[in-house]
Amino acid sequence: MTNYLYILALQIAEAESEGGLFDFNATLPLMAVQILLFMVILNAVFYNPVAKVLDEREEYIRKNLTQASDILAKAEAITKQYEKDLAQERREAQLIISVAQKEAQDIVALEIKQAQKDTELLVNEATSQLNSQKQKALSALEDQVNTLTEQIKSKLLSNQLIS
């Protein structure tokens, strides 16, 4: 049994001396070649297509951002031009409104003056008609007064002659 333990200890010592953390035999360069081959395959199959897609996407985004910036600049320029045109149109409309108001005020003033003249003419005409009628009435009254005075006079005289 002691021999058996001795043989087991020798086998364990032999196993430890053969394989350690790094074995410098043909396996190490083979593993290095496998890693390099794996890296080349991954680069060709995975990394290059992914990098290409990422580059295309970046270019697409950059292109869209540039187009959006151009469109935004054009929209802002158009907006400024429309605002400028709108301000000019408002000024012109305000000028037209003020001219129309002045013309309307002038027309109203003329119509008021004409109405005042017409009213004055009507008043003068009515006054002259009233004065004319007054003169006629006074003349008629004077004639009647004269007639009545003549009648009274003749009655008085006839009464005096009779008495």
Swiss-Prot record:
GO terms for cellular component: chloroplast thylakoid membrane; proton-transporting ATP synthase complex. One of its GO terms (molecular function) is ATP binding. It is a single-pass membrane protein. In plastids the F-type ATPase is also known as CF(1)CF(0). Belongs to the ATPase B chain family. HAMAP family: ATP_synth_b_bprime (MF_01398), ATP_synth_bprime (MF_01399). This is ATP synthase subunit b', chloroplastic. It comes from Guillardia theta. The gene is atpF2.
